[in-house]
Amino acid sequence: MTRDLLVDPDALREQVRGKYREVAVDPGASFHFHTGRGLAARLGYEAAVAGALPDQAVESFAGVGNPFSLRRLTPGERVVDVGSGAGFDSFIAAGQVGPGGHVVGVDMTPEMLAKSRQTAAALGLAHVQFRHGLAESLPVDDCWADVVISNGVINLCADKHAVFAEIFRVLRPGGRLQFADIANGRPVPDGALRDIDLWTA
């Protein structure tokens, strides 16, 4: 099915990628959103869990909620993290599913992927993998995941129908989605939807 999108998805992706490249390279810079350990604490992440992760995994965290507040993951589960960034939620997921589980983080920003991969190697986590890809075309097999998590990512995608279709595709029958995101309960004017700068403002 073809949908008329009011913003160019490729142009929007490039804008978003540029913003999160900055967050990866210079996480201490000033952004219009919060980042790091202080943000994780405000969002209700367990202090002991976040505190056990190295700075590299936490400093570029820019989520909007806590997908684990919905339900704790079960040992042995297979998890896909859509828009995994520097890996903060992926590493928490890895701790919850244990070495018998598996976590695949997917992100489109090379600088974020580099950080997450370096951290996974430093922590010796063989059951965590980070792949380059888009939320609209996840590099994951059909029906692979028990759980899909995401944090503050879907609102930045122009074609949300495509994102949710991909999530449905990679989830096994009976699997679940645990995500945190930004939602607007009122219609957004077309002019605002066409303004790429407003998507990341």
Ranges and model annotations:
Residues 109-111:
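Conserved SAM/SAH-binding beta-strand->alpha-helix loop
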Residues 75, 136-147:
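A short acidic, Gly/Pro-enriched loop at the edge of an enzyme's catalytic core
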Residues 33-78, 88-96:
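Conserved alpha-helix/loop element of class I SAM-dependent methyltransferases that forms part
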Residues 182-201:
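Short, glycine-/aromatic-enriched active-site segment of Class I SAM-dependent methyltransferases
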Residues 1-43:
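N-terminal auxiliary segments of SAM/dcSAM-dependent transferases
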Residues 123-137:
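Conserved SAM-binding strand-loop segment of SAM-dependent methyltransferases
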Residues 95, 161-176:
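A short glycine-rich, Lys/Arg-flanked "PGG" loop and its adjoining helix->strand segment in the class I
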Residues 116-117:
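Conserved SAM-binding loop
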